[in-house]
Amino acid sequence: MSVISMKQLLEAGVHFGHQTRRWNPKMKRYIFTERNGIYIIDLQKTVKKVEEAYNFTKNLAAEGGKILFVGTKKQAQDSVKEEAQRSGMYYVNQRWLGGTLTNFETIQKRIKRLKDIEKMQENGTFDVLPKKEVVQLKKELERLEKFLGGIKDMKDLPDALFIIDPRKERIAVAEARKLNIPIIGIVDTNCDPDEIDVVIPANDDAIRAVKLLTSKMADAILEAKQGEEEAEVAEETAPETETTTA
């Protein structure tokens, strides 16, 4: 059975690409036709590519791999946060800070600062500090949480990135490629598919389309985790084999 149906894709508007004047010729193989000045994506190919992305994600998660969800455009922000949290993964849904991957040590220092201020808030330090200082610390905490909250528990570089709109997230794409980190991407008709390891040709502007595809990647991770748990339970409950000596 397919991971996703043609009906689901149609209902979410996954097939609507960009205007024909705003396209990347490299996406030609994923385009079905043109209608009223808009390219229509070939959903038969999208179904296959979603399946490929699902299996890639599931296999990676089954091996303990960590995936960073990236989508900073308005249409993606909520889905990226919700689905990454649902599947226990990391996310960036505000501005991508240059060096998030390539200057990971510096980012870790900022995350440490975030956690230090959180501790101060929790252990009562705020109560004994001057009001003015507390206001400044709260502002700093809010800013750090906004940009780093989704990766504050990411102790190492991710094993893959799931990106919505690689054109918008070109800095993230460049950093991942520099470090040979594989990229799964929702790629619209105006993007360059050659930069992405696992391409999902789809509308990256419709909230419903983004939500549907992002939730499928989260489902793949959860399926892998469920498989691990079931294997552990089976191992624990398996009867011990007795060895008999002749």
Curated annotation (Swiss-Prot):
SUPFAM superfamilies assigned: Ribosomal protein S2
The keyword Ribosomal protein is annotated on this UniProt entry: yes
Keywords: Ribonucleoprotein, Ribosomal protein
Keyword hit for Ribosomal protein: yes
GO biological process, one term: translation
GO cellular component: cytosolic small ribosomal subunit
Protein name (Swiss-Prot/TrEMBL): Small ribosomal subunit protein uS2
SS bond list: none
Lineage of source species: Bacteria, Bacillati, Bacillota, Bacilli, Bacillales
InterPro entries per the UniProt record, alphabetical: Ribosomal_uS2 (IPR001865), Ribosomal_uS2_bac/mit/plastid (IPR005706), Ribosomal_uS2_CS (IPR018130), Ribosomal_uS2_flav_dom_sf (IPR023591)
Complexes and interactors: Part of the 30S ribosomal subunit. Interacts with BrxC.
Pfam families: Ribosomal_S2 (PF00318)
Record-linked PROSITE patterns: RIBOSOMAL_S2_1 (PS00962), RIBOSOMAL_S2_2 (PS00963)
Family: Belongs to the universal ribosomal protein uS2 family.
Provenance organism: Bacillus subtilis (strain 168)
GO molecular function terms attached to this record: structural constituent of ribosome
Record HAMAP family: Ribosomal_uS2_B
PANTHER family membership: 30S RIBOSOMAL PROTEIN S2 PROKARYOTIC AND ORGANELLAR, SMALL RIBOSOMAL SUBUNIT PROTEIN US2M
Bias (Acidic residues): 229-239
